[in-house]
């Protein structure tokens, strides 16, 4: 059973390595070995190098898979995640604004960002969700001059057609 679990751990390492673009000879695999002291474990290198590319893969005595990365790599990963999150948010806001037919996109964007900053200042929790549809609806209600009035345009077109 232990060999089967060990094989599954290595299969998972293969899968993760492949998705990260790591070749077999580039990955570092270590075993986490318990000692007499329950507060201490020894790391035993199984393949690769202690100078190898990250992440490093560790397998404990229960065949559970662990990874290890440097603070520098972890910080870069967090920053990349935050950048992707911001880009996603910006794209969603842009889409919502365009769906409401702005007269001047950048004016609506500035008002929306000001509203978002106000909401963020009121929130104690840094992670909060904003209903962008509702936000833009409120902006449209408070600043109707920033958006094209479709009903008005249709009435104007009908009245011209009737003339």
Curated annotation (Swiss-Prot):
Q: Name one Pfam family in it.
A: DUF2603
Domain of life of the native organism: Bacteria
Q: Which family does it belong to?
A: Belongs to the UPF0763 family.
Q: Which HAMAP family does the protein's record reference? A: UPF0763 (MF_02110)
Q: What is the official name of this protein in its record?
A: UPF0763 protein Ccur92_13550
This chain's source organism reads Campylobacter curvus (strain 525.92)
């Amino acid at each position: 059973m232990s060999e089967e679990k060990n094989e599954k751990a290595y299969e998972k390492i293969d899968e993760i390595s492949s998705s990260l673009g790591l070749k077999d000879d580039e990955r570092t695999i270590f075993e986490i070995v318990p000692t007499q002291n329950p507060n201490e474990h020894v790391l035993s290198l199984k393949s690769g190098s202690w100078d190898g590319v990250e992440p490093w893969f560790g397998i404990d005595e229960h065949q559970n898979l662990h990874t290890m990365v440097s603070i520098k790599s972890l910080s870069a990963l967090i920053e990349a995640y935050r950048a992707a999150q911001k880009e996603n948010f910006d794209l969603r806001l842009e889409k919502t604004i365009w769906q409401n037919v702005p007269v001047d996109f950048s004016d609506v964007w500035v008002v929306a960002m000001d509203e978002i900053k106000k909401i963020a200042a009121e929130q104690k929790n840094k992670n909060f969700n904003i209903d962008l549809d509702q936000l833009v609806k409120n902006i449209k209600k408070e600043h109707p001059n920033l958006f094209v009035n479709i009903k008005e345009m249709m009435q104007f077109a009908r009245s011209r057609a009737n003339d």
